[in-house]
Design a protein with these regions (language model features):
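Intrinsically disordered, low-complexity, charged terminal extensions of DNA damage-control enzymes
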Residues: 1-37
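Alpha-helical scaffolds flanking conserved acidic
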Residues: 9, 39-43, 79, 123-124
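Alpha-helical ds-nucleic-acid-binding substructure associated with the helix-hairpin-helix region
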Residues: 21, 25, 53-54, 58-131
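Alpha-helical scaffold segments that form or flank carboxylate-/histidine-based iron centers
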Residues: 37-52
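Catalytic DNA-binding helix-loop module of base-excision-repair DNA glycosylases/AP lyases
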Residues: 119-164
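Short, charged, surface-exposed loops that flank catalytic or proteolytic processing sites
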Residues: 169-176
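Conserved small/polar residues in nucleotide/adenosyl-binding loops
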Residues: 180-187
């Protein structure tokens, strides 16, 4: 069963009341259904695979992985050779990152489910200790797996492009948003 990012009329109404331009976009675009990956390890793999490649390439590779592995778990990833993982279209470096993360999880060196008990900053700090994971990947995991609503990834190119289009700015700065508890809902249509 496909799961989607959870938000409702309350969040949309709040945003529309706070920002005229955003209200116009929400009225024009309508309800956005954005898939989430509730399995944290699968979401981690998804995030690593999607780094610095086109959306189309990411979707193609992700479909291959899902078709072959079914449920994506550390055990299933470790059971494959590097070459088998690369055949999905994953680069050697990303395969290394994914397998190292799977190994750390299986060895108990990294408690992926413990992330739920951490603040956003702590999640970023913990995930950034894994090879190949930085702030962007951690933010994507918090947003599209953990469904944390107060995430706005300023470094995400799609979000920057969307903000530029809505607000007609050349440069997007990382200034506080007056309705921070709803940041994720602002950008769902941009991703």
């Amino acid at each position: 069963m496909t799961e989607y990012f959870q938000y409702g009329e309350k969040e949309l109404s709040y945003l529309k009341q706070r920002d005229k331009r955003l209200s116009e976009i929400i009225d024009k675009v309508g309800w956005v259904k954005r898939r989430v990956i509730p399995n944290l390890f699968a979401a981690l793999v998804h995030s690593i695979v999607g780094q610095q490649i086109s959306t189309k390439a990411h979707e193609t590779i992700w479909q291959r992985i899902q078709s072959s592995l079914g449920e994506i778990t550390p055990q299933r990833v470790i059971s494959l050779t590097d070459e088998e993982l690369q055949r999905f279209g994953i680069s050697f470096k990303k395969v290394t990152y994914i397998k190292r993360a799977a190994t750390k999880i299986l060895n108990g060196e990294f408690d992926i489910h413990g992330l739920y008990d951490k603040t956003d900053e702590e999640v970023i700090e913990c995930l950034s200790k894994l090879d190949g994971i930085g702030t962007w990947s951690a933010e994507m995991l918090m947003l599209f797996s953990m469904q944390r609503p107060d995430i706005l990834s300023y470094s995400d190119l799609a979000i920057q492009r969307g903000l530029r289009m809505v607000y007609h700015h050349r440069d997007i700065t990382r200034k506080p948003v007056s309705y921070t508890h709803l940041r994720a809902h602002e950008t769902l249509s941009d991703l």
